[in-house]
Design a protein with these regions (language model features):
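Active-site metal-binding loops of divalent metal-dependent hydrolases
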Residues: 74, 170, 340
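Short beta-strand micro-motifs in enzyme catalytic cores
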Residues: 52-56, 183-185, 261
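Metal-dependent amide/peptide-bond hydrolase catalytic core
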Residues: 186-395
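Acidic/His- and Gly-rich active-site-bordering loop/insert found
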Residues: 1-102, 120-127, 361
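Fold-level recognition of mixed alpha/beta catalytic cores in primary-metabolism enzymes, strongest
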Residues: 99, 104-105, 109-218, 237-239, ...
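Short helix-capping segments at alpha-helix termini
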Residues: 37, 122-126, 156-158, 289-298
Length: 395
């Protein structure tokens, strides 16, 4: 444990980097900590949902092949209005064996560990480049990684892009080589309005949406029943494609026939599946729906589907030098699958093999009173240094 580690964590947690807000101040702080250690730094501006965000790339070491990327996202999920908070979300608080604050688990705690490891790094021992990639807007679809992954070659210039990336998402120091894709889409039902006393003169969008949800729910049961044997151990909690109704909005008054209803849905497919196949099958099934509501009127509702976002799956090859190094420092003997999506999926699209391993506990991610265990937090910098030594310093 070092005072510097806790000082950095305190500063990082204090930045309000909810995805809907700019992360520039936090990224400037991180760059300011790395530059005195000899790191070259570059901020990549990205305009995301109308908010000025930046990705940060920092690199050190000779411009030789191989090396290592270590990555984490700076943004967090919201905390305003989230019930259950008993502590100030943007204040790092130590209580017993826990360290509280938004982002301590997901995943500013890991970034603080990276800065502590860099703070004591002997750069003269580097034989291959070390690259930190800290991203924006991971929590709303890995948008920062989608932008920075293809740009790394240009950003790094004469330094070759490392082909291995360590993503420090919360795994309780387990190792994951895979995760499912994440696809989100919207269904809009457009009915015909009117007075609720004459329901047959309109068509109720909410009533038709109930049929939409029943149709999608039936398909979900089919997906859940398909459990390929090769994924029973990788995703033991859900070795299948999974689907979730996220939000629904419709209607403005009890005495009005609802004209419009919108449903947002997300689903996750196994790594070897084509992510959009499920979406296209849902489109096909919804196109076959009648469009009448239960009142039996002449009008039919229109059912429209629109794709919102895609995060590709991750299924990294086994037996890499990074996997061996992570097994060594964590004591793990095998890797599995993560239940969430990560920036690693977009890095993989740029030819970078990614593994997931971090100090946080997934059960604490996005929760009120988010925290990380002190033992998991304190041991992180030494683990990061050992992996750097093995992949960037060893002959």
């Amino acid at each position: 444990m070092s005072d510097y580690l806790y000082d950095v964590a305190k500063r990082l947690v204090a930045f309000d980097t909810v995805s809907s807000k700019s992360d520039r101040d936090a990224m400037d702080y991180i760059a300011g900590e790395l530059a005195p250690r000899g790191f070259k730094t570059a901020l990549q501006p990205v305009e995301l949902s109308g908010v000025a965000q930046v990705n940060l790339v920092a690199w050190l070491g000779p411009p030789t092949a191989d090396g290592l990327i270590i990555s984490g996202h700076v943004d967090t999920v919201p905390f305003d209005g989230q019930p259950g908070w008993e502590r100030a979300p943007l204040t790092l608080e130590i209580a017993g064996e826990r360290i509280y604050g938004r982002g301590t688990t997901d995943m500013k705690g890991f970034i603080a560990q990276c800065l502590d490891a860099a703070h004591t790094l002997d750069s003269t021992r580097l034989k291959r480049p070390l690259v930190f990639v800290f991203t924006a807007s991971e929590e709303i679809g890995c948008l920062g990684a989608h932008s920075v992954g293809p740009a790394l070659k240009q950003i790094l210039g004469e330094t070759p892009v490392p082909r291995l990336a360590w993503i420090g998402e919360p795994t309780s120091w387990g190792v994951s080589h895979a995760h499912k894709s994440i696809v989100s889409f919207q269904v809009t039902v457009r009915g015909a309005g009117g007075h609720s006393g004459a329901p047959a003169k309109g068509v109720n969008a909410i009533a038709v949406m109930a049929r939409v949800m029943d149709t999608i729910g039936g398909y979900q049961q089919e997906l859940t029943a398909r459990r390929p044997a090769e994924y029973l151990e990788v995703f033991p909690d859900a070795p299948c494609d999974v689907l979730n109704f996220g939000t629904i909005h419709g209607g403005i008054a009890l005495n009005m026939i609802t004209e419009e209803c919108k449903l947002r849905v997300s689903y996750r497919t196994l790594p070897d599946a084509e992510p959009l196949d499920v979406f296209h099958e849902i489109e096909r099934r919804l196109a076959a729906l009648d469009g009448h509501d239960y009142a039996g009127g002449e009008h039919r509702a229109k059912i429209e589907t629109s794709l919102l976002n895609i995060v590709p799956p991750l299924n990294s090859p086994r037996g890499t030098a990074l996997e061996s190094a992570l097994f060594e420092v964590t004591g793990e003997k095998t890797s599995g699958g993560a239940l969430y999506g990560t920036d690693g999926s977009w890095f993989t699209r740029s030819g970078i093999t990614s593994l997931i391993c971090g100090p946080g506990d997934l059960e604490q991610a996005h929760q009120p009173n988010e925290h990380v265990r002190r033992d998991a937090f304190d041991r992180g910098p030494a683990m990061i240094r050992k992996v750097i030594e093995r992949l960037c310093c060893a002959a």
